[in-house]
UniProtKB/Swiss-Prot annotation:
Domain of life, per lineage: Bacteria
Example GO BP: positive regulation of translation
Domain annotation tr-type G: ranges: 6-188
InterPro entries with a match to the protein in the record: EF-4, EFG_III/V, EFG_V-like, EFTu-like_2, G_TR_CS, LepA_C_sf, LepA_CTD, LepA_IV
MF-aspect GO terms: GTP binding; GTPase activity; ribosome binding; translation elongation factor activity
Protein name per UniProt: Elongation factor 4
Keyword Ligase among UniProt keywords: no
Reaction(s) this enzyme catalyzes, per UniProt: GTP + H2O = GDP + phosphate + H(+)
Family note: Belongs to the TRAFAC class translation factor GTPase superfamily. Classic translation factor GTPase family. LepA subfamily.
EC number(s) on file: 3.6.5.n1
One GO cellular component term: plasma membrane
Organism field: Caldicellulosiruptor saccharolyticus (strain ATCC 43494 / DSM 8903 / Tp8T 6331)
Topology relative to the membrane: Peripheral membrane protein
């Protein structure tokens, strides 16, 4: 007897940036007739303006499509669109857990890239059936046969009969759909067991509250049921369930095992629907949650302060709204003597940080200034206490610190042969430890390094691209903490420490860094009527200094000839005045000076 599930296929599309994932999704949506031609637009699933502009997918999306296969049966497809970027690896892994299969899109002109690898390994960990598809075969520079061989060599997937498609021209898309029906297994699961549903994303809707995007593994969920989140124990009453059509929510009576859809239960914040959590029936709960849930910890921190005509309250409101849709964003109020009141924010990684900053500026029209990004250090004090420090100003004094550890990542870099030297040199400059090197065919190399996250946070990505003329691709994962010789560098202006400019740096690099900063500040701080010393120090030892010279009035202008003692008297008087001014004068540090130094940090 055929079960209802036998006609369901849950799958996602994995690809490196720009290999044509969203375009393929567009074609599949078009072919299955989910949208009329009038509603069709490019990158249907990328709803955020930034997603379209950068050509990246940030939030996971899911759509239900109906497909009449060549065997005459009608199938239900659930296409779950995943983010492709390293910062969102956890979201990707949850989206993959909601599927039984994945389509691996590889660009016929580029071959395999670092992020493709990272996501494929994730898919293999979840035991997904992977269908390799070679895209962009309409381009003159396409080399499908080499790419097939590459897929076999590097990933070990049989790609001999991989569909050759062009998502842009719509060539061979049917073949992909038939392969989905043929190769991807239908969902397992039993709708008579207690409810188990995996949350793989959540979205805040102004009318319905938080919508949890779920994949139902066992059981049934329908309105008026009481559901329970297994990680927090919070309970809610379901108000509506349904599934997704592109850009629309379609309410339905129930979601059964194997279905992908949404649950609305008048939940107030996204915090309550944690990605990766299991939803179960409060009256008949499941014994244990689905595996793989973990709490997201921010890896990169920076301060965000309002500037110009932006008010603190506006910034707070904007961050709260962003947080509704972005459970990984963390922020707490912070004040700095130099920048006033603002927030300390935590992010999953660099791209996440950039996107949040960009959304604040674009969607909420705010003027903000961000301090240099820092990572979370683990500090062991001499009395044995262990602290996690994300803000250099909170570091205990040097005499109380027993050891400092910094987060390390495993970086995988794929690079063409001719740039290997340059890239290895870059990794060494960034205190990387060489681990492994392997060749793909004869033209490309996979390098594996262990590196401090701190070195990647600044501008590793840009440096990598510029030294490899844009050909290298890169992926990283956190592996743990390692002890390191770190110091806190303070910048003193006229003898006072400026908190916004303090940062933690490796001892070997402290001097160059300090030199650069004091020189930059000297250019940026306007001259006052007294001289201003700018010093960079570690503890009480000054390691670099510049002085902004004083402006002086020409007091001798009115003495034409005259006696030298008269001139001396006037000069002495001026000197006295300057000395007094220096004691009581305040230094105005313009906002531009901060910006310049923080940019130089990069």
């Amino acid at each position: 007897m055929e079960r209802r599930q036998d006609r369901i296929r849950n799958f996602c599309i994995i690809a490196h940036i720009d290999h044509g994932k969203s375009t393929l999704a567009d074609r599949i949506i078009e072919l299955t007739g989910a949208l009329s031609e009038r509603e069709m637009q490019d990158q249907v699933l990328d709803t955020m303006e930034i997603e379209r502009e950068r050509g990246i997918t940030i939030k996971a999306q899911a759509v239900r499509l109906n497909y009449k296969a060549k065997d005459g049966k009608e199938y239900i497809f659930h296409l779950i669109d995943t983010p492709g970027h390293v910062d969102f690896t956890y979201e990707v892994s949850r989206s993959l857990a909601a599927c039984e299969g994945a389509i691996l899109v590889v660009d016929a002109t580029q071959g395999i890239e670092a992020q493709t690898l990272a996501n494929v390994y994730l898919a293999l960990e979840h035991n997904l059936e992977i269908i390799p598809v070679i895209n962009k075969i309409d381009l003159p520079s396409a080399r499908p046969d080499e790419v097939k061989k590459e897929i076999e060599d590097v990933i070990g997937l049989d790609a001999s009969d991989a569909p050759l498609i062009s998502a842009k021209q719509g060539i061979n898309i049917e073949e992909v759909l038939e392969r989905i029906v043929r190769d991807i297994p239908p969902p397992k699961g039993d709708d008579t067991k207690p409810l188990k549903a995996l949350i793989f994303d959540s979205l805040y809707d102004n009318y319905k509250g938080v919508l949890a995007y779920v994949r139902v593994f066992d059981g049934v969920v329908k309105p008026n049921m009481t559901i329970k989140m297994m990680s927090t124990g919070a309970q809610f009453t379901v108000t509506e369930v349904g599934y997704f059509k592109p850009g629309m929510l379609i309410p339905c009576e129930e979601l059964r095992a194997g279905d992908v859809g949404y649950i609305a239960a008048s939940i107030k914040t996204v915090r309550d629907t944690r990605v990766g959590d299991t939803i179960t029936d409060a009256n008949n709960p499941a014994d244990e949650p689905l595996p793989g849930f973990r709490k997201l910890n921010p890896m990169v921190f920076c301060g965000i302060y309002p500037t110009g005509d932006t008010k603190y309250e506006e910034l707070k409101e904007a961050l709260e709204k962003l947080q509704l849709n972005d459970a990984a964003l963390f922020f707490e109020p912070e004040s700095s003597a130099a920048l006033g009141f603002g927030f300390r924010c935590g992010f999953l990684g660099l791209l996440h940080m950039e996107i949040v900053q960009e959304r604040l500026e674009r969607e909420y029209d705010l003027n903000i200034i961000t301090t240099a990004p820092s990572v979370v250090y683990r500090v062991t004090k001499t009395n044995g206490e262990v602290l996690y420090i994300d803000n250099p100003t909170k570091l205990p004094p040097p005499n109380e610190i027993d050891k400092m550890e910094e987060p390390m990542v495993k970086a995988t870099i794929m690079v063409p042969n001719e740039y290997v030297g340059a890239i290895m040199e870059l990794c060494q400059e960034r205190r990387g430890i060489f681990k492994d090197m392997s060749y793909i065919e004869t033209t490309r190399v996979i390098l594996t390094y262990e590196m401090p996250l701190m070195e990647i946070v600044y501008d590793f990505f840009d440096a990598l691209k510029s030294r490899s003329k844009g050909y290298a691709s890169f992926d990283y994962e956190f592996i743990g903490y390692a002890e390191s010789n770190l110091v806190k560098l303070d910048i003193m202006i006229k003898g006072e420490v400026v908190d916004a400019l303090s940062f933690i740096v490796h001892r070997d690099k402290a001097y160059q860094r300090a030199r650069k900063i004091v020189e930059k500040l000297k250019e940026e701080i306007p001259r006052h009527l007294f001289e201003i010393p700018i010093q960079a120090c570690i503890g009480s030892k000054v390691i670099a200094r510049e002085t902004v010279k004083a402006l002086r009035k020409d007091v001798l202008a009115k003495c034409y000839g005259g006696d030298v003692t008269r001139k001396k008297k006037l000069l002495e008087k001026q000197k006295e005045g300057k000395k007094r001014m220096k004691q009581i004068g305040e230094v105005e540090i313009p906002q531009e000076a901060f910006m310049a130094v923080l940019k130089l940090e990069e």
